[in-house]
Amino acid sequence: MAAETASGYIQHHLQNLTYGQLPDGSWGFAHSAAEAKAMGFWAFHLDTLGWSVALGLIFLLIFRMAAKKATSGQPGGLQNFVEVMVDFVNGSVKDSFHGRSPVIAPLALTIFVWVFLMNAVDLIPVDWIPQLAILISGDPHIPFRAVSTTDPN
């Protein structure tokens, strides 16, 4: 692991994989929280961006699979799950938005499912995905956070 002490362990888990413009004008990865802070506006949290895109693709894949296998007769488990989510969001939109707009319900469904999936990543133990990142990168000190909802950026 990246730290020998409990304090170091916690500090390591509070840092994102940050890529940005360093104070000398070059671009690179931040190796500490101070370097990440010095990058200012031009700092990109690659772990957050990567998980956001990956979860968005998972959302699209699941809903596409459900749409392709949808039947009007006897629905399967995935179709039931998607229908429950769509009905829940549709009911919430109808209760809170009384106008007519073709954009509101699909947008609400997208946001609901994306936040649901981002919070579902919390069910994975905190060290598993960073350990996978360490195995892939070969860098035992790589800061990597899998839970995108903890990033205020």
UniProtKB/Swiss-Prot annotation:
Membrane topology of the entry: Multi-pass membrane protein
One GO term of the biological process aspect: proton motive force-driven plasma membrane ATP synthesis
Matches recorded under Pfam families: ATP-synt_A (PF00119)
Disulfide partners: none
Transmembrane segments: 43-63, 104-124
A Gene Ontology cellular-component term: proton-transporting ATP synthase complex
UniProt-recorded Gene Ontology molecular function terms: proton-transporting ATP synthase activity, rotational mechanism
Keyword Transmembrane helix: yes
Keywords: ATP synthesis, Cell inner membrane, Cell membrane, CF(0), Hydrogen ion transport, Ion transport, Membrane, Transmembrane, Transmembrane helix, Transport
The organism's place on the tree of life at top rank: Bacteria
Places the protein is found: Cell inner membrane
Similarity annotation: Belongs to the ATPase A chain family.
Function description: Key component of the proton channel; it plays a direct role in the translocation of protons across the membrane.
Subunit description: F-type ATPases have 2 components, CF(1) - the catalytic core - and CF(0) - the membrane proton channel. CF(1) has five subunits: alpha(3), beta(3), gamma(1), delta(1), epsilon(1). CF(0) has three main subunits: a(1), b(2) and c(9-12). The alpha and beta chains form an alternating ring which encloses part of the gamma chain. CF(1) is attached to CF(0) by a central stalk formed by the gamma and epsilon chains, while a peripheral stalk is formed by the delta and b chains.
Name listed for the protein in its UniProt record: ATP synthase subunit a
Organism name: Pseudomonas putida (Arthrobacter siderocapsulatus)
